[in-house]
Regions:
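A hydrolase-biased, glycine/serine/histidine/acidic-enriched motif that marks catalytic-domain neighborhoods
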Residues: 1-178
Length: 178
């Protein structure tokens, strides 16, 4: 999957510096693309990860066997209601079902994904409210990035891409990019 996105990126911008930023599966893709760009000798000026963890650190078999955590199911219901309310009658439940299907596809893709070593610096924004117990970002990402800068966010995974979260994330990114 990274190779497909890498080809698309290179068709638009054959040479760096590259600025990559991704959330969840998108972060996994951004990290994999960054690694491949560096292997080609290209400059990756920024790699931002929004609550992204190496797929190797997730126990997918356990998650599949146990089904979704009740807290996760409650969060999905909350998100569905918030989404439908925000659409003010412009979207249907079918649209949210399609979004849920995309989420299920992302989880399926992550079960077979493998991280590649990126020798540069990554900036990770961690959603502290849903961080798995014992997940130390420096330890977990150590084998996969050359350097890691971590910024904790007081939110859940699904909320790290909300306007409220970006009120805190935006200034950090602006400062880094100078």
């Amino acid at each position: 999957m990274c190779e497909h996105h890498l080809r698309t990126l290179l068709a638009q911008q054959p040479h760096g510096p590259y600025y990559l930023f991704g959330y969840s599966l998108g972060g996994t893709l951004a990290q994999g693309i960054a690694a491949r760009l560096r292997q080609r000798g290209e400059a990756v000026a920024f790699l931002g990860l929004l609550d992204t963890w190496p797929p190797e650190t997730q126990n997918w078999a356990e998650k599949e066997a146990n089904g979704l955590d009740p807290e996760v199911l409650a969060e999905i219901d909350r998100e569905r209601e918030a989404f439908l309310a925000a659409q003010q009658g412009q979207a249907s439940g079918e649209l949210f079902s399609a979004i849920e299907g995309n989420y299920a596809d992302a989880v399926r893709l992550l079960t077979t994904a493998h991280s590649a070593k990126f020798d540069g610096k990554a900036t990770l924004f961690v959603a502290e409210k849903t961080r798995q117990e014992g997940m130390d970002p420096q330890v977990v990402w150590g084998p996969w990035v050359g350097e890691l800068e971590v910024f904790s966010q007081n939110c859940a995974h699904v909320d790290i891409i909300s306007p409220q979260a970006f009120e805190a994330i935006g200034p950090v990114v602006r400062e880094i990019l100078g």
